[in-house]
Curated annotation (Swiss-Prot):
The modification N6-(pyridoxal phosphate)lysine is found at residue 705. Keywords: Oxidoreductase, Pyridoxal phosphate. GO terms for cellular component: cytosol; glycine cleavage complex. It catalyses: N(6)-[(R)-lipoyl]-L-lysyl-[glycine-cleavage complex H protein] + glycine + H(+) = N(6)-[(R)-S(8)-aminomethyldihydrolipoyl]-L-lysyl-[glycine-cleavage complex H protein] + CO2. This is Glycine dehydrogenase (decarboxylating). It comes from Synechococcus sp. (strain CC9902). PANTHER family: GLYCINE DEHYDROGENASE (DECARBOXYLATING), MITOCHONDRIAL, GLYCINE DEHYDROGENASE, DECARBOXYLATING. The keyword Oxidoreductase applies. GO terms for molecular function: glycine binding; glycine dehydrogenase (decarboxylating) activity; pyridoxal phosphate binding. Pfam families: GcvP2_C, GDC-P. The glycine cleavage system is composed of four proteins: P, T, L and H.
Length: 958
């Protein structure tokens, strides 16, 4: 049965598909597919026996509603980095549920991403002001991996060859400790978990991680310890609670070199563990080592301020195995939400929330003492931890009253607890404190007493208070009313380009439809309000959802098992390589440490390999863009005794189905290695071929590409891995679940990673069904080949498969334009903005080219509109080649053209205003204006500004 959803997911209608096939010389889609996908990997049919039949959105939502109802939403006061938070309705409606925000891509084309970049600059400013550190990035994946990145930075900048010890506060969050263990071992880093008072330093210590407040809730002044660490040449990272940080002096004042944490409690629901925006702030000295994206200010060609991604040369897509991190996707959408939460509340509002939580904590402590429950006299923020013989009874009474408390020690059943912890959050109030005290009173057999009045003094005496003005920037004060904030959000939207405006043809990025029905369940409280460490029997709906997804994805990829834990494609790569490494070690092959990687590979591949403790050896590609099989055989033979893995992307990064993929896998296996397949291009394979069936041992999938989770302007993403049966025992574990002895440690803070967005992919697969998924892949291939055909006479297609066809994307060669007219790939990218399009992927995997991926969701009219735009641009280049247009002062070199420039009283350019801004007739009805003119990136990197201007700076500028 054809899925009723299919016609909504596909851009081209059946009639348009037939037209496209005829253009390419085919009558039937099946005949076309047989020409594109090699015979030895093409499946006769998709896995109908495992995947559900397709259905409409109402049926799928009803089915998912039944699953969601299995989740029991209790009041979780567990804490440990996850807290209840109230997302302002304005932000939920105008940001979280707004496709103009969630369908955009990473802001590489900054001139059409100024709105998102401003929201991210607000986020960086928020973090910088909270921490007192001048450089903050635009988000990381979660707090645990941010701490691991801090360990990596500290290790990387240390120049003492003997230094390999990293000291970790014994009060660090348990999931952070677990992820640190995973990260440290492959790099040869020795971890020592110790009470800060007992920390001893020698020349082997390169770094320290402190938690403030600690997992036990305690606050203390780390100044003396940090001075001792610095005297020993070690960097100090402090993991902070951003809400607590509103009350006391910035951690930079105590001497911290790096601050990390999670912005989850700034308006982002717990979501059973994610996604949430982590943050990373550091000193100016480490600006070129900071991981992740960094937004900075520069100027455009007209001299106006403009924002863009700064210092990109340190990132994995350029530095590869020498990169500071393998991070690619981060958590932009969640960082944007957190930034608007801060704009919504302002510094006074944030502080008021924090002070209220301290008051509730003091009130609860006082109530416990009236019940003769001993509470240590100490400064805390929002958390109380208690050791008592009544702990099992307290947990039972709290559960009966609808509360989940932290079970102490971590990881034991509540019936065996020796203590409990309570962390108050934004939903807490005095009534909740009273209910908790009633539960404790029942547990300890004391009469129920009236809760003490709210504490008047909320000072945190062990730490100096925050007294300097902070968040003085106008953005955090100007939008107090909902009307003003709504207009501000919309003003930023108008400065961006997303899928609501038109096709985003980025190669290797799969910017396909993110259907509203797929995203709707993410806001359901059954998914949004669960704590990741809640009792497992309260998350049966999530387990059902995960089981379905794991089973469906395994069937589609041909693997035996799937882990959904990795919360980005880069994390999937890393996890997959660790699984391979663990398998080799289980066989006594500890010496296998060589990872073969084609020279065309995405930069995350070598960066991930290095993080996994492997050494990268490059494999050449031939003139057709395929892996040079002779060179592969030579490298495999040369390193046969040490070969751990080959990392290969399929279809290749050059946009073709290589015919020798089975043979490539056989060569690697014959020499003792495993095959890691990068699933970035899986959108060309779903329902047509299965990596596990043609020789891959591991494959990561990008749910934010192939399976419809939106890109969010640069995250969130999900990067699960599928593995063959012999590798299944080594899939990532987690300390809060039953972790097997063979499992590698966790790669993400939560067991299910970014759990709350998994319903998106579940909905997509449920509505599509097996046959529709195969059809979608086929149409993705058809659309790419249609564009390749239309554009080939104007921009040669650089690589084609054995039958002359491309896969789901194609590379257009622009290098002759540079030679003949002085027009480079950036000129084309910027000129496309004037035509209303985001540029394709620029200068990757081949410099001077663009890589185009249309996906199956774009209509024939949109494909033609894009082709017409590129052909018109080619005509403009010809005018330069013939001398009809000036070589320097032309629409390409001056692109993009802003409304201000076009409407200026003086127009001194040798081409018309219409040619500048309305080069195609249909643009008079649908015009997207770049917010700024071409940005000077070099100027911005030389004059790095990564926070909003202060009131004083704004006043001076005015």
């Amino acid at each position: 049965m054809t899925s009723p959803f299919l016609q909504r997911h596909l851009g081209p209608s059946e009639t348009e598909q037939h037209q496209m096939l005829q253009t390419l010389g085919y009558q039937h889609l099946d005949d076309f597919i047989k020409d594109v996908v090699p015979d030895d990997i093409l499946d006769a049919a998709p896995p109908r026996n495992v995947l559900p039949a397709g259905c409409g959105e109402a049926e799928a939502l009803a089915d998912l509603g039944t699953i969601a109802a299995k989740n029991l939403v209790q009041r979780s006061l567990i804490g440990l980095g996850y807290h209840g938070t109230a997302t302002p309705a304005l932000i939920q409606r105008h940001v979280f549920e707004n496709p103009a925000w969630y369908t955009a891509y990473t802001p590489y084309q900054a001139e059409i991403a100024q709105g998102r970049l401003e929201a991210l600059l607000n986020f960086q400013t928020l973090i910088s002001e909270l921490t007192g550190l001048p450089i903050a990035n635009a988000s990381l994946l979660d707090e645990a991996t941010a701490a691991a990145e801090a360990m990596g930075l500290s290790f990387g900048v240390c120049r003492r060859p003997e230094a390999n010890r990293f000291l970790v506060d014994c009060h660090v969050l348990p999931q952070t400790w677990a992820v640190l263990q995973t990260r440290a071992e492959p790099l040869g880093i020795e971890l020592e978990r110790v009470d800060p008072e007992q920390m001893a330093f020698d020349t082997r210590v390169f770094g320290v991680l402190l938690q403030l407040p600690g997992a036990d809730g305690l606050l203390w002044d780390p100044t003396t310890l940090i001075e001792r660490a610095h005297d020993a040449g070690a960097l100090v990272t402090v993991a902070i609670d951003p809400l607590a940080q509103t009350l006391f002096a910035p951690v930079a004042d105590f001497g911290a070199d790096i601050a990390v944490g999670s912005a989850q409690r700034f308006g982002v629901p717990m979501g059973f563990g994610g996604p949430h925006a982590a943050f990373f702030a550091t000193r100016e000295a480490y600006k070129r080592q900071i991981p992740g994206r960094l937004v900075g200010e520069s100027k455009d060609a007209e001299g106006n301020p403009a924002l863009r991604l700064a210092l990109q040369t340190r990132e994995q897509h350029i530095r590869r195995d020498k990169a500071t991190s393998n991070i690619c996707t981060a958590q932009v959408l969640l960082a944007v939400i957190a930034s608007f939460y801060a704009v919504h509340h302002g510094p006074d509002g944030l502080r008021a929330i924090a002070e209220r939580l301290v008051g509730l904590r003091l009130q609860f402590e006082a109530g416990l003492r009236t019940l003769d429950v001993a509470v240590e006299e100490a400064d805390r923020f929002d958390t109380v931890t208690v050791t008592t013989t009544h702990a099992p009874a307290v947990h039972a009474a709290a559960a009966e009253a609808g509360f989940n408390l932290r079970v102490l020690p971590d990881g034991v059943p509540a019936s065996q607890a020796t203590g409990f912890g309570v962390s108050f959050d934004e939903f807490s109030d005095q009534k909740e404190v009273a209910h908790l005290l009633e539960a404790v009173a029942r547990a300890v057999g004391k009469p129920v007493s009236t809760a003490p009045a709210s504490a008047a003094n909320t000072a945190l005496l062990s730490l100096p208070s925050r007294i300097r003005p902070w968040l003085t920037q106008p953005a955090f004060h100007r939008y107090r009313s909902e009307t003003e904030l709504m207009r501000y959000i919309q003003r930023l939207v108008s400065r961006d380009l997303s899928l609501v405006h038109g096709m985003i043809p980025l190669g290797s990025c799969t910017m396909k439809l993110n259907a509203a029905a797929e995203l709707l369940p993410v806001s359901w409280p059954e998914f949004a309000r669960l704590h990741p460490f809640a009792p497992l029997d309260q998350a049966l709906g999530y387990r059902h959802l995960a089981d379905d997804l794991e089973r469906w994805l395994a069937a589609l990829t041909g693997f035996a098992a799937v882990s959904l834990q990795p919360n980005a494609g880069s994390q999937g790569e890393y996890a997959g390589l660790l699984v391979i490494r663990a398998w080799h070690r289980s066989r006594g092959d500890n010496h296998r440490d060589i990872c073969l990687i084609p020279t065309s590979a995405h930069g995350t591949n070598p960066a991930s390999a290095v993080m996994a403790g492997l050494k990268v050896v490059a494999v050449a590609c031939d003139a057709e863009g395929n892996i040079d099989q002779d060179d592969l055989a030579a490298r495999a033979t040369e390193y046969a005794d040490r070969l751990a893995a080959l990392m290969v992307t399929y279809p290749s990064t050059h946009g073709v189905f290589e015919t020798g993929i089975r043979h490539i896998c056989e060569v690697v296996h014959r020499h003792g290695g495993q095959v890691y397949l990068d699933g970035a291009n899986l959108n060309a394979q779903v329902g047509l071929s299965r990596p596990g069936a043609f020789g891959a041992d591991v494959c990561h999938l990008n749910l934010h590409k192939t399976f419809c989770i939106p890109h969010g302007g640069g995250g969130p993403g999900v990067g699960p891995i599928g593995v063959a049966a012999h590798l299944a025992p080594f899939l990532p574990g987690h300390p809060f679940e039953n972790q097997t002895a063979s499992a590698i440690g966790p790669v993400s803070a939560a067991a299910l990673g970014s759990a709350s967005i998994l319903p998106i992919s579940w909905m997509y697969l449920r509505m599509m069904g097996a046959d529709a998924l195969r059809q979608a892949s086929a149409v993705a291939l058809l659309s790419a080949n249609y564009l390749a055909h239309r554009l080939d006479d104007h921009f040669p297609v650089l690589f084609r498969g054995a039958t002359g066809r491309v896969a789901h994307e194609c590379i257009l060669d622009l290098r002759p334009l540079k030679r003949d007219a002085g027009i480079d790939v950036d000129d084309i990218a910027k000129r496309l903005m004037d035509y209303g399009f985001h540029a394709p992927t620029v200068s990757w995997p081949v410099a001077g080219t663009v890589m185009v991926e249309p996906t199956e969701s774009e209509s024939l009219s949109e494909l033609d509109r894009f082709a017409d735009a590129l052909i018109a641009i080619r005509d403009e280049v010809r005018a330069i080649e013939t001398g009809a247009m000036d070589a320097l002062n032309n629409p390409l070199k001056r692109a993009p053209h802003t409304m201000a420039a076009v409407m200026a009283e003086v127009w001194d350019r040798p081409y018309s205003r219409q040619q500048a801004a309305f080069p195609l007739p249909d643009q008079t009805q649908n015009k997207v204006w770049p917010a700024v003119a071409r940005i000077d990136n070099a100027f911005g990197d030389r004059n790095l500004i990564c926070t909003c201007p202060s009131v004083e700076a704004v006043a001076i500028a005015a």
